[in-house]
From Swiss-Prot:
It catalyses: [protein]-peptidylproline (omega=180) = [protein]-peptidylproline (omega=0). Gene3D superfamilies: 3.10.50.40, Trigger factor ribosome-binding domain (3.30.70.1050), Trigger factor, C-terminal domain (1.10.3120.10). GO terms for biological process: 'de novo' cotranslational protein folding; cell division; chaperone-mediated protein folding; protein transport; protein unfolding. Belongs to the FKBP-type PPIase family. Tig subfamily. It is found in: Cytoplasm. This is Trigger factor. It comes from the Bacteria. It is an enzyme of class 5 (isomerase). SUPFAM superfamilies: FKBP-like (SSF54534), Triger factor/SurA peptide-binding domain-like (SSF109998), Trigger factor ribosome-binding domain (SSF102735). It holds the Pfam family FKBP_C. One of its GO terms (molecular function) is ribosome binding. Keywords: Cell cycle, Cell division, Chaperone, Cytoplasm, Isomerase, Rotamase.
Length: 432
């Protein structure tokens, strides 16, 4: 077998392969022998069909089967021998496939780029340092109390954290518009569900009042006919309710688990959960900065086939999240996922090189610690640890995560890392 490799464009390669006629003829003969033992033709016993009838009836399909075997086999033999790191599936084009002649074909495929890491010392990473305060825990307790709150009707004016029941009719230039009308609409004030100015226009009014609110739809509003338009809403305020928070008693805290018997227990449990969430958020924030730096310092082309595979993964994940079926999945435009898919392939290649160049292997002790951390969020942590330890697929997933963390650490060791004091809210609610 002779081999000729050609670079076409970018990461695309074309390989011309010649398979000697002796190999081809032998493969054809063996396939005919196999067929002769198994084909059924009326009027003949199995295994006794004359060769010329087999040729007439099945010759073309037999040769196609031979071709289907020879093409990938000799292609992969060739690329393995040449140590070519292929991406995706090759496409084949037959040049010659005739009796008594060599099989000549070409395979077009993509390769993964050769990655040589550079510029790690130029990567800048800001590493937040955060201390969870008693005030942070107080805020979390307030959230829990609000989740258990009841509502009491009020005759006072509307405040920012009340619940109101209203009728409203919206109009633009004196004309009502679709979706701008509701009856007995329950609105939780302060949650920002409505367009800017709507909730603010209700604050200070009393139940039974009728009044107008002037607002302007945002320029990025989803309805094209309302973008940037000035609108008027006629409001009828039917009912105002104040939030009544439960007292912070032992009875209240007992709702949050069998081991939570006092306010002190609740605060300790909240701190533990906040520390776990904070740790994950900090790891994610630092990792994203490392990824951004790696991509910026090491711009690489990626195989289109690998990007396409990743697009399909993202498309399927999106469909599952929204309960779509296979047909709906195929209709989701690839452009929605292309940028993220490209980034994922880049990250995979760059992390692989970090792992390879630093000869990293998953730290088993670190993997055990990660499982213990996951298990601590459950009521029966020992059972969770045992479940992981007996499931090789889950264990491998954990090892992969650990290996990525070790790769991040390897980059951080060479990067420019600065620390910044931050609050819990700044890390957990960056958009707030």
């Amino acid at each position: 077998m002779s081999l000729n490799i050609e670079t076409t464009q970018g990461l695309e390669r074309r390989v011309a392969i010649t398979v000697p006629t002796e190999i081809v003829s032998k493969a054809v003969r063996e396939e005919f022998k196999r067929a002769a033992k198994n084909v059924r033709v009326d009027g003949f016993r199995k295994g006794h069909v004359p060769a010329h009838i087999i040729e007439q009836r099945f010759g073309a399909s037999i040769r196609q089967d031979v071709l289907n075997d020879l093409l990938p086999r000799h292609f992969f033999d060739a690329v393995i021998a040449e140590k070519i790191n292929i991406a995706g599936r090759p496409t084949f084009a037959i040049e010659t496939f005739e009796e008594g002649k060599d099989l000549v074909f070409t395979a077009t495929f993509e390769v993964y780029p050769e990655v040589k890491l550079q510029g790690l010392e130029n990567i800048k990473v800001e590493k937040p340092t955060v201390e969870i305060t008693e005030a942070d825990i107080d805020k979390m307790i307030d959230v829990l109390r609000k989740q258990q709150a009841t509502w009491a009707e009020s005759q006072d004016v509307v405040k920012a954290d009340d619940r109101v029941t209203i009728d409203f009719v919206g109009s633009v230039d004196g004309e009502e518009f679709e979706g701008g009308k509701a009856t007995d609409f329950v609105l939780f004030m302060g949650q920002g569900r409505m367009i800017p100015g709507f909730e603010e226009g209700i604050v200070g009014h009393k139940a039974g009042e009728q009044f107008d609110i002037d607002v302007t739809f945002p320029a990025e509003y989803h309805a094209e006919n309302l973008k940037g338009k000035a609108a008027k809403f006629a409001i009828t305020l039917k009912k105002i309710e104040n939030m009544v928070l439960p007292e912070l008693t032992d009875e209240f805290v007992a709702k949050f688990g069998p081991n939570t018997k006092s306010v002190a227990d609740l605060r300790a449990e909240i701190r533990k959960n906040m520390e776990r969430e904070l740790k994950n958020a900090l790891v994610s924030r630092v990792k994203q900065q490392v990824i951004n730096g790696l991509i910026e310092q090491n711009p690489i082309d990626v195989p289109a086939s690998a990007v396409e595979e990743e697009i399909n993964v993202l498309r399927n994940q999106a469909a599952q999240r929204f309960g779509g079926n296979a047909q709906q999945t195929a209709q989701l435009p690839r452009e929605l996922f292309e940028a993220e898919a490209t980034r994922r392939v880049q990250v995979g290649l760059l992390f692989s090189e970090v792992i390879k160049s630093n000869e990293l292997k998953a730290d088993e002790e670190r993997a055990k610690a990660m499982i213990a951390d996951i298990a601590s969020a459950y009521e029966q942590p020992a059972e969770v640890v045992e479940y992981y330890s007996k499931n090789e697929e889950l264990m491998n997933n954990i090892r992969n995560v650990v290996l990525e963390e070790q790769a991040v650490d390897a980059v951080l060791a060479k990067a420019q890392v600065t620390e910044k004091v931050s609050s819990f809210d700044e890390i957990m609610n960056p958009q707030a």
